[in-house]
Amino acid sequence: MFLAQEIIRKKRNGLALCSEEIQFFVQGITTNSVSEGQIAALGMAVYFNDMNMDERIALTTAMRDSGTVLNWQSLELNGPVIDKHSTGGVGDVISLMLGPMAAACGGYVPMISGRGLGHTGGTLDKFDAIPGYQTEPSSELFRKVVKEVGVAIIGQTGDLVPADKRFYSIRDNTATVESISLITASILSKKLACNLDALAMDVKVGSGAFMPTYEASEELARSIAAVANGAGTKTTALLTDMNQVLASCAGNAVEVKEAIDFLTGAYRNPRLYEVTMGLCAEMLLLGGLASNEADARAKLNRVLDNGRAAELFGKMVSGLGGPADFVENYSKYLPQSQIIRPVFADMQGYAYSMDTRELGLAVVTLGGGRRKPGDALDYSVGLTQVCALGDKVDSSTPIAVIHAQSEAAFAEAELAVKKAIHIGETAPEKTPEIYAYIRASDL
């Protein structure tokens, strides 16, 4: 028998907690036998004194086991259960292509995603732009679509990781969100509750990333790779660039359109292609669906070129309540804003740098993102044709096209976009889309 206050005292004094102490405390979070004040105190103690890898693994697995852990055995799936998670960015539409691509190569992708908050977009918000699509289906329907289609992208159900929900809301109110140990446990407990065979983790770096510096992003990526592998899930973390918008657009309906254009081959943004292929190839390798990276990329290109990935996206949409002809006729279903107009830079030159976070906040200002949880969204608004770093811009080449519902909203977004995209006389040095892979062998 443990006492919550003694566990807090031990961590306050900089000592390591044993797994039984951590399990006891997490159980208390779930059953409400540990008070809000005690949870806040432990969060602050961890924030200042950190946790070693054994503690992080114990916290992650205890939180994972605080609710339902999905079981796929009864479905007799004939392939690995694989997934990816991103720390969030702007124009990060990867999940919409990656899920069907991995499924078309023989994987099963039960992706539980989140909504956007602050400057980052949420995968679920993009699916909410599709009429009829159920982001909160019954567990029976979720399992049915995973088995029959190979991919289902939905929201977190109430019985998954209840400890994280309570802990996170208290951390948010007590300034302990920015702890690498607690971020690691929060992210991974939700993913590992899906009982995955393998996970590819996309940790963003740069002006649109959650972590402020490359070093902090790398520390988080290493922590996630170490803890996930330590908890028994084959995991690789990729450090990817978020110093500019990832796709050519940012918003909800506009990103769904770009995802379908990518899957059908109508248009593939080269940066988006590189990061999507890097993550998806890693999923195939970890899941045993490819023998090496070249083999994985060849398989992925095949399912893009033969239309199989686009077909599975369509089947997932209709399986979860959306229109059966969505891929073929998406323009009929996606909402469109009142004003669609380009914005031009005040000088000619090259797109030299971007404050990606500010571009994400411009989408929020238009009504396409949330200032606080629960805010209603306008799925039609956003940015399209966003220039890439190094692009030449002048009076006839826009730096972006704004989709707005009013002149006032357009004017506000225009100012924000001009301020966020810096024009220089020369093109900047090219940076890689993927900075590093952190595999189990690198830890």
UniProtKB/Swiss-Prot annotation:
<dbReference type="InterPro" id="IPR017459">
    <property type="entry name" value="Glycosyl_Trfase_fam3_N_dom"/>
</dbReference>
<dbReference type="InterPro" id="IPR018090">
    <property type="entry name" value="Pyrmidine_PPas_bac/euk"/>
</dbReference>
<comment type="function">
    <text>The enzymes which catalyze the reversible phosphorolysis of pyrimidine nucleosides are involved in the degradation of these compounds and in their utilization as carbon and energy sources, or in the rescue of pyrimidine bases for nucleotide synthesis.</text>
</comment>
<dbReference type="GO" id="GO:0046104">
    <property type="term" value="P:thymidine metabolic process"/>
</dbReference>
<dbReference type="Pfam" id="PF07831">
    <property type="entry name" value="PYNP_C"/>
</dbReference>
<dbReference type="InterPro" id="IPR036566">
    <property type="entry name" value="PYNP-like_C_sf"/>
</dbReference>
<dbReference type="InterPro" id="IPR000053">
    <property type="entry name" value="Thymidine/pyrmidine_PPase"/>
</dbReference>
<dbReference type="GO" id="GO:0006206">
    <property type="term" value="P:pyrimidine nucleobase metabolic process"/>
</dbReference>
<dbReference type="InterPro" id="IPR036320">
    <property type="entry name" value="Glycosyl_Trfase_fam3_N_dom_sf"/>
</dbReference>
<comment type="subunit">
    <text>Homodimer.</text>
</comment>
<comment type="pathway">
    <text>Pyrimidine metabolism; dTMP biosynthesis via salvage pathway; dTMP from thymine: step 1/2.</text>
</comment>
<dbReference type="GO" id="GO:0009032">
    <property type="term" value="F:thymidine phosphorylase activity"/>
</dbReference>
<dbReference type="GO" id="GO:0004645">
    <property type="term" value="F:1,4-alpha-oligoglucan phosphorylase activity"/>
</dbReference>
<keyword id="KW-0328">Glycosyltransferase</keyword>
<dbReference type="InterPro" id="IPR035902">
    <property type="entry name" value="Nuc_phospho_transferase"/>
</dbReference>
<dbReference type="Pfam" id="PF02885">
    <property type="entry name" value="Glycos_trans_3N"/>
</dbReference>
<dbReference type="InterPro" id="IPR013465">
    <property type="entry name" value="Thymidine_Pase"/>
</dbReference>
<dbReference type="Pfam" id="PF00591">
    <property type="entry name" value="Glycos_transf_3"/>
</dbReference>
<dbReference type="GO" id="GO:0005829">
    <property type="term" value="C:cytosol"/>
</dbReference>
<comment type="similarity">
    <text>Belongs to the thymidine/pyrimidine-nucleoside phosphorylase family.</text>
</comment>
<keyword id="KW-0808">Transferase</keyword>
<dbReference type="InterPro" id="IPR013102">
    <property type="entry name" value="PYNP_C"/>
</dbReference>
<protein>
    <recommendedName>
        <fullName>Thymidine phosphorylase</fullName>
        <ecNumber>2.4.2.4</ecNumber>
    </recommendedName>
</protein>
<dbReference type="InterPro" id="IPR017872">
    <property type="entry name" value="Pyrmidine_PPase_CS"/>
</dbReference>
<dbReference type="InterPro" id="IPR000312">
    <property type="entry name" value="Glycosyl_Trfase_fam3"/>
</dbReference>
